[in-house]
Every structure is written in C-alpha cells, then in structure tokens.
Amino acid sequence: MVITEMTPRNTIAAIATAIVPQQGSVGIVRMSGSEAMKIAQTLFHAPGKQVWETHHILYGYIRHPHTGQLVDETLLLIMKAPRSYTREDVVEFHCHGGIIAIQQVLQLCIEAGAELAQPGEFTLRAFLNGRLDLTQAESIAELVGSQSPAAAQVALAGLQGKLASPIRHLRACCLDILAEIEARIDFEEDLPPLDESEISQKLDDILVDLSMVLATASRGELLRTGLKVAIIGRPNVGKSSLLNAWSHSDRAIVTDLPGTTRDVVESQLVVGGIPVQVLDTAGIRETEDRVEKIGVERSCQAAESADIVLLTIDAQVGWTELDEVIYQQVKHRFLILIINKVDQVDLVHSELIRSIFYPETIKNVVATAAINNQGIEELEAAILNAVNLDNVQPENLDFAVNQRQAAALTRAKIALEQCLNTIKNNLPLDFWTIDLRGSIYALGEVTGEDVTESVLDIIFSRFCIGK
C-alpha cells in the first residue's frame, strides 16, 4: 500500500469479517469516508419511519440501485464522525453469512463510488485522524493475531496506551533537556552555564527507564510467535505417549512396535501463556525401510528448526549407545532431557539413572510417566525457565514491545549513550543537541509522532483487509 497523502479524502469499503470455507451466520461490509452515508442511502431501503441517526441500527433491504433487484435483508449500523473507529462517517451492512451476499453488497458499494480498502486502511485512518497512536494501531493487529490469553492481554494493554505512556514520558524528558541546551546556545550571555553532572544524571535516568522498556522485547516476541518444541529420541521411548498426555488428546498413534511414528505429528499448546508448537517425531535409528528413513530425516530436521529439543529416553533401559548418538547430533541445541517411564522402575533405579546414565553436561532433566500424566507440570516449568519466562501470566503483564518498536528504542538508547560520551569528552553544546535530537526522533517513531510514510506503509500492509 502506497500512502500518497496524509489526509484521506476518498470513501473506502471492505468486507470486515473473515472469509472462510465454513459459512458464518453474519457477514459485515464496512465503509468509511465522507460519502459513506450517501452510498448507504442509495443502496439501503429501511421500511417504516426509521430514523437515520448516528449510533442507531436500521433494519431493511439492500437493492440494486438501477434494477431494484433484492440483494439481501440486512441491518445497517450508522456511526457518524467523529464518534467512529476512523473518526470519519462509518456505516456497516450486517448481512447474512455466506460469501455471495457480502461480495454482492461490497460490489454495489464500489459501483456507487467507494474504493476497495487496502490492508489496514481503516486503522490507518484512525491513526491519521488522531484516534489512535502507532502503538495502539499495532496492538490492534496483535490482538487480532494473538494465539494465547497472555498475548491478547499484552495487546490490550498496548491498545489502552500502557506502552505509549512511558515512551511519551521519556521523549518529553529528552525534549526538556534539549530545550535547556538550546537556550544556553541562543542566550549564552543571559543564562548561567549548564550543570553537566545534572544533565548527565538525567540522561542516565532516562537510559535506565528505556532499558526496562526494551527488556520486554524478548517476552513480546515469544508471546507473538511462540516456541517450537521437538520431541526426539530412539523408537519406543514414549515420545508419542508424551505428546498425547501433554496435549490431552490422541494426536499420535501409540503401539509397542518400533517405527510406528513415521512422520512429524504437530500439536498446538499454550504453556504459561506462550503458544507452543509441539512436534512428535519418528524414532531415530538405522533402518532400511524407505518410508521410515524419510521419517528419521524429518526428525533431524525438526530438531534443527526447534527452539527447544526434548531428548527422550526410557528409564527402564537407561542411557544407550543410540541415545549417545542422538545426543551428539542435537547437543548444540537447547536441550531438556526427558526420562520417561519412571513409573516402571523403582526409586533406587531412578536415582541411578539420574546419576550415571546420561552426560553431566545435560543440566535440564525432567522425569515423566507419560501414561499417567506424571511430570507434565515439571516439563512445562522447565520450558518456561529455559526462556526465562517462568511466570508469564496475564496478571503479571503490562506491555511488551514488538520488533519494530525495539529497533527504534535501541536507536534511541544508542543516541543517548552517544550524548553522554559527547558531554564526557567536553564537546560543544551543538554536538549534544545532535544526539538528543536523534533520540527524540527515534522515540517519536515508536508512537508515531515522528514517522515516515514508508514506515506506515510497512506497518499497515500487515493488517487484514477490512481492519
């Protein structure tokens, strides 16, 4: 999407509900712009004495404006500017579900003068018209795409301005310091000299707060993209049973025959608020079976692509030569050792396994009995601990910055550090202002106070059409 002007004048239309193979009960066509009401009045016929007032719902029919042919029986929602999502006149046709009806309604809107909306254009208008800042706009996209309650909670926090608030405060502090410096440059003879130690302390305080905001980036990335976890090991150690116990389902086939799992079986879970894609893989061993050999290759590929590898062994057998071979293949990955089937051995045997049956270099070890659901909580705790997120719950979250925001905040941090070095090296005040301006601009990029059209283009093109 190319933004040619910063003040939209055309009227846009799009289908606002998801288009899926399964038909929903309702489909919505949304319009926004100065001509939205006029187009709606051309297409929509409300029987009786219904009043076309803002924030009212009308009942009626959509007919072709030239032929009078009935298209659908609908509800019409009216939201006049500025009390709308975009702060423009907005109307929504609530049609019967099914792609044919809503596509026909959309086509009539376009024929009547509306333009097909680009991805994210409704939210872009909300931003350009001052209803949302850029962090709030991005939070809407993140809320729509959230895969867990914790991710949704973080997105809602951003939508409520909890991320923008500290960023604006830091930017205001930088602007205050810049004003002090520029006043000394312009009115050097009329004002006392700057206290360099005081300015440096203020910059240090800003850097501390900025670093705290930046520290949420890794948490935010995990909440948005999740983790990929691969369960690997030799045949018949209970990998599929572990997946089934963990996912509370029968996703994987379980038998006593080696080589039952011949392909990667996936399951989507949420662990401590983090979306987790779990991959149950074929048992790794030397085999002449062509199909099983392909499965073994895919197991190795899954281990390479995973964020965390669960190397699973059998407590009844202990650490075998094949376990050692597999370990050597995956030891460069982040590894958690799963000692499965501990319910089949006595306590003494279990302690022996813990002490001598696996390399001392494996520090993360969890004992499980998948068939009895034993050890699942400990496994989840080990995974969260592995990514330093052992308490990511909605009640413990305020906000988390995304990748774009983190990049801008990093630029702001670097500029502030350069400003401190400039002061330390006794360079002229003009040099101080260069670094400070760089930091102020970078902070403004986060909230949208200083942002280029190309950046807006990238951000809003990631939205769905109709949002």
From Swiss-Prot:
K(+) binds at N236, T255, L257, T260. Pfam families: MMR_HSR1 (PF01926), MnmE_helical (PF12631), TrmE_N (PF10396). InterPro entries: G_TrmE (IPR031168), GTP-bd (IPR006073), GTP-bd_TrmE_N (IPR018948), GTPase_MnmE (IPR004520), MnmE_dom2 (IPR027368), MnmE_helical (IPR025867), P-loop_NTPase (IPR027417), Small_GTP-bd (IPR005225). Residues 226-388 form the TrmE-type G domain. Binds 1 potassium ion per subunit. Mg(2+) binds at S240, T261. It is an enzyme of class 3 (hydrolase). Its EC number is 3.6.-.-. (6S)-5-formyl-5,6,7,8-tetrahydrofolate binds at R30, E92, R131, K467. Keywords: Cytoplasm, GTP-binding, Hydrolase, Magnesium, Metal-binding, Nucleotide-binding, Potassium, tRNA processing. GO terms for molecular function: GTP binding; GTPase activity; metal ion binding. One of its GO terms (cellular component) is cytosol. GO terms for biological process: tRNA methylation; tRNA wobble uridine modification. Its cofactor is K(+). The keyword Metal-binding applies. It is found in: Cytoplasm. Gene3D superfamilies: P-loop containing nucleotide triphosphate hydrolases, Probable tRNA modification gtpase trme, domain 1, tRNA modification GTPase MnmE domain 2. NCBIfam families: mnmE_trmE_thdF, small_GTP. Belongs to the TRAFAC class TrmE-Era-EngA-EngB-Septin-like GTPase superfamily. TrmE GTPase family. Exhibits a very high intrinsic GTPase hydrolysis rate. Involved in the addition of a carboxymethylaminomethyl (cmnm) group at the wobble position (U34) of certain tRNAs, forming tRNA-cmnm(5)s(2)U34. This is tRNA modification GTPase MnmE.
